[in-house]
């Protein structure tokens, strides 16, 4: 057994040295080494998760084609379970209770089904759209990044999928750069919302058939934390959203906001409720 390993490593080492000297150490060579190790492990009947040629000298790891990744779907005994998220591949074998055949998340194994992490669709897989995330909402992009962080923390990173997010050399594609740009925009927007909520806490709200929707402010409305002021209810609009939320505006800013629909932060805007007195502590409206 160990003699065979030494023979394999010696062969691999000589191959890599020759490739480096010849200036041709590219993806094809790494893929060749991985296939050789796979074949050896299959013949030896050992656990294919042993990291022999799977380890790369950089943070790229192994480059998988979609077809190669599909081999790690749990159908072949002895192979580990791999899934991809946003083009990154993780070994989820230790979570076999969740990712094994017939289990809840087996749908994700052997493929990149990033969109399903958001949609919750574990039945339909379309390889043309399964990892096309650019049409998702900003909060969903943040959610996907959170899932990726989870896998990086709790599971073993194995490499990258050649396709939408990474090219044949493992470099980020134009699509991936666009995703990162949209993700940063989403995070900026979320930070703005959090700052707005801290500056203008939410209102209490209730509905009745008789009076419609009632909104009002108290010293704990919004996040439930005690503050020194009560505030007055106003409609808070955010960028690209026709709907509004109720926000409590402090006395010191009330006149300035009502004078011209003051932009409170970025593209957010505060406006008074119709048919409600400027300094009323509660307002009523019907949708």
Curated annotation (Swiss-Prot):
<dbReference type="GO" id="GO:0016020">
    <property type="term" value="C:membrane"/>
</dbReference>
<dbReference type="InterPro" id="IPR050577">
    <property type="entry name" value="MAPR/NEUFC/NENF-like"/>
</dbReference>
<dbReference type="GO" id="GO:0005576">
    <property type="term" value="C:extracellular region"/>
</dbReference>
<protein>
    <recommendedName>
        <fullName>Neuferricin homolog</fullName>
    </recommendedName>
</protein>
<dbReference type="GO" id="GO:0012505">
    <property type="term" value="C:endomembrane system"/>
</dbReference>
<dbReference type="InterPro" id="IPR001199">
    <property type="entry name" value="Cyt_B5-like_heme/steroid-bd"/>
</dbReference>
<feature type="signal peptide">
    <location>
        <begin position="1"/>
        <end position="22"/>
    </location>
</feature>
<feature type="domain" description="Cytochrome b5 heme-binding">
    <location>
        <begin position="61"/>
        <end position="146"/>
    </location>
</feature>
<comment type="function">
    <text>Heme-binding protein.</text>
</comment>
<keyword id="KW-0175">Coiled coil</keyword>
<comment type="similarity">
    <text>Belongs to the cytochrome b5 family. MAPR subfamily.</text>
</comment>
<keyword id="KW-0964">Secreted</keyword>
<feature type="coiled-coil region">
    <location>
        <begin position="175"/>
        <end position="204"/>
    </location>
</feature>
<dbReference type="InterPro" id="IPR036400">
    <property type="entry name" value="Cyt_B5-like_heme/steroid_sf"/>
</dbReference>
<dbReference type="Pfam" id="PF00173">
    <property type="entry name" value="Cyt-b5"/>
</dbReference>
<keyword id="KW-0732">Signal</keyword>
């Amino acid at each position: 057994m160990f003699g065979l390993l030494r023979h394999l490593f010696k062969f691999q080492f000589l191959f890599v040295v020759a490739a480096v000297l010849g200036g041709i150490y590219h993806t094809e060579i790494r893929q060749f080494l991985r296939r050789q190790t796979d074949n050896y492990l299959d013949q030896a009947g050992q656990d294919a998760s042993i990291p022999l040629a799977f380890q790369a000298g950089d943070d790229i790891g192994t480059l998988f084609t979609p077809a190669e990744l599909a081999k790690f779907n749990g159908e072949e005994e002895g192979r580990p379970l791999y899934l991809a998220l946003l083009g990154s591949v993780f070994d989820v074998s230790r979570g076999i209770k969740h990712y094994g055949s017939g289990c809840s998340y087996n749908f994700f194994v052997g493929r990149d089904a990033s969109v399903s992490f958001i949609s919750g669709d574990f039945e339909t897989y379309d390889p043309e759209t399964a990892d096309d995330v650019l049409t998702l909402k900003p909060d969903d992009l943040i959610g996907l990044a959170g899932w990726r962080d989870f896998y990086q923390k709790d599971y073993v990173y194995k490499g990258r999928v050649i396709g939408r997010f990474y090219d044949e050399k493992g470099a980020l594609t134009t699509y991936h750069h666009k995703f990162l740009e949209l993700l940063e925009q989403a995070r900026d927007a979320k930070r703005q919302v959090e700052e707005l909520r801290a500056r203008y806490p939410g209102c209490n709200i209730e509905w009745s058939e008789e009076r419609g929707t009632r909104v009002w402010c108290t010293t704990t409305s919004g996040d439930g934390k005690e503050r020194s002021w009560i505030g007055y209810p106003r409609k808070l609009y955010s960028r690209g959203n026709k709907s509004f939320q109720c926000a409590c505006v402090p006395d010191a800013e009330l006149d300035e906001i009502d004078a011209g629909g003051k932009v409170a932060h970025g593209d957010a805007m505060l406006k008074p409720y119709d048919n409600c007195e400027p300094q009323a502590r509660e307002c009523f409206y019907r949708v």
